[in-house]
Every structure is written in C-alpha cells, then in structure tokens.
Amino acid sequence: MINVSMLIADFPKQEEIADELIFSLAKGNREALKIIYEKSINALYAYVLSLTKNKYDTEDVLQETYVSIAENAASYHGGNKAMAWIFRIAKNFTLMHFRKEKNKESIHEVEEAVDAKYSFSFVENADHRMLLESAMEILEEEERQILFLHAVAGWKNREIVEYLGKNLNTVLSKYQRSIKKLQEHLGKDE
C-alpha cells in the first residue's frame, strides 16, 4: 500500500550548501560550481518542475540558473541560507521564462508542453514515479511550491513564509490541503 509519506520519502533531499562554496566560486574556483550543482540539482530540478510542469522548460531554466550562479557569486553576501539564494535565482528565471513564452506561444509549443509533462526521473521506484507524475497534476501551483519547499528542500514553515511572502496560516493550510489532495488521489489509484 502506497501512501503520501512513502512518496514524499522518494523526493530527493537537499544537501546544505555552505557560504564558503559560493565565496570560493566568486574567487574563480570552478570546482565549487560542480559541488554546488551536485548538492542542489535534484532538489532544484524538483522545485522548478513544480513551477513549469514541463521537463524541457525546467532544463532550460536550470541551465540559466547555474550560469547565473557562476556569474553572480560575487554578489552573494552570505548570512542567509545559500540554497534560498539559489532557489530565488531559479524562481526569477522561471518567471522570466514564462514571460518570454507568453509572448511567443504557438500550437507547436502547446503540443510539446502536453507531451513533456512532469518527469520525476530522480525517483527510482517506477510505481512511485508514475503516481507522483499523475498526482502533481491535481495540485495548484502554490500548493506544489509549498510541498516541494517543505518536502524536498527541507525548509521550515517560517522560511517558506519569508520566501513566498505569504502568511503562516496560508502556508500551513496549503501544505495540509496538498497532502490531503494527494491522499485522496492515491486512494482512487489503489
């Protein structure tokens, strides 16, 4: 029997990124970028995918995100969570991507988007992967964001509140609502 807790356990967990890695990257150490990438790619992929709902768009946004991290490491001042800085860069590139796409959407792109839905290739269990892919379709964008920030990035509620600019009650209720929707969805599939 599969439950929401088992599915969430399959999400990639974010590893902490020390400020020193970003400072080292700012000084030209390209090995630091490789380490940042390795520690953040799975959680960041899942988060951006929760926003775009399209693996191709997600890959484009992530490429721009990591280039920006390399180019702007010197502007990072530390003191905050490094992953919050990285997630904010990814969110900004996602928003820019949506603006660009809105201006040039075509029938071909819409067909491509339908074919390229969620891809949870990082989830090893094939049954869990298929359930996650279908379950994500039932959540609203903000519910997906909150779920991923909590379950994948391991953020505390107050960190999610600060990041999204929402109040605590909204974050808590949307998280609970997303869990309930997933539980109901899984009940239908079993």
Functional labels for PLM-detected ranges:
Residues 95, 143, 152, 157-189:
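DNA-recognition helix of helix-turn-helix
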Residues 8-9, 26-35, 45-64, 168, ...:
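Short, charged helix-capping/linker segments at alpha-helix termini
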Residues 71-78, 88-108:
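Arg/Lys-rich amphipathic alpha helix in sigma70-family domain 2
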Residues 26-27, 53, 64-81, 100-101:
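Sigma70-family region 2
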Residues 46, 60-67, 80-92:
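Structural recognition of an alpha-helix C-terminal capping motif at a helix-to-coil junction
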Residues 1-23, 35, 133-141, 162, ...:
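Intrinsic, short, N-terminal disordered tails of RNA polymerase sigma-factor systems
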Residues 39-42, 50-53, 148-155:
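Short helix-capping/turn signature of helix-turn-helix
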Residues 2-5, 14-15, 96, 103-129, ...:
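Internal acidic/polar
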